[in-house]
Amino acid sequence: MAQKALEQTTVKEEKLELPTTIRGLAQLLDIPLVDCLLPCNFCGRFLDYLEVCEFDYKKLTLIWKDYSVYACCRLCCSATATYEFNVFYQQTVLGRDIELATGLSIFEIDIRCHTCLSFLDIIEKLDSCGRGLPFHKVRNAWKGVCRQCKHFYNDW
């Protein structure tokens, strides 16, 4: 019985040690970031170097399946964001009303871009609040528009 508990603890510890970022994986393997070849979890295509950098910049998390690692390419990030918005949309608030809806300060709210899934920094969040742009609640998480995707909406 004690041995079984020890084995379960060991398995849990092993899973906790798996890196969640590509940079962390590269450091663990002691290889340059440019040499990391990761398949996309959705389409199977390998991420190019720019997508590898974007993945970590967006603060996305690696997906581990039986000790095989997967990431998400740029196109699949956009497709996933669109799918989640269309299927799991809950509500929309404008500008500073997000603080009333959540009961939190804009500084404390985690917001991702609803187009590319990048985390919005404080400047992007304050800009959206100041302009009265919409924030959408999708799958119990808040979505806005990042500075790069704003250009697609001609809002710069």
From Swiss-Prot:
An example GO biological process term is: symbiont-mediated suppression of host type I interferon-mediated signaling pathway
| Zn finger (unnamed) location | 40-76, 113-149
Give the matching Gene3D superfamilies.
E6 early regulatory protein
Query: Where is the protein found, in the record's own terms?
Result: Host cytoplasm; Host nucleus
Task: Write out the entry's keywords from A to Z.
Answer: Activator, DNA-binding, Early protein, Host cytoplasm, Host nucleus, Host-virus interaction, Inhibition of host innate immune response by virus, Metal-binding, Modulation of host cell apoptosis by virus, Transcription, Transcription regulation, Viral immunoevasion, Zinc, Zinc-finger
Output the superkingdom of the source species: Viruses
GO CC terms of this entry = host cell cytoplasm; host cell nucleus
* Family, as annotated: Belongs to the papillomaviridae E6 protein family.
Relate the assembly described in the record. Answer: Forms homodimers. Interacts with ubiquitin-protein ligase UBE3A/E6-AP; this interaction stimulates UBE3A ubiquitin activity. Interacts with host BAK1.
Q: Summarize the protein's role.
A: Plays a major role in the induction and maintenance of cellular transformation. E6 associates with host UBE3A/E6-AP ubiquitin-protein ligase and modulates its activity. Protects host keratinocytes from apoptosis by mediating the degradation of host BAK1. May also inhibit host immune response.
Q: What is this protein called?
A: Protein E6
Q: Which organism is it from?
A: Human papillomavirus 47
What gene is behind this protein?
Answer: E6
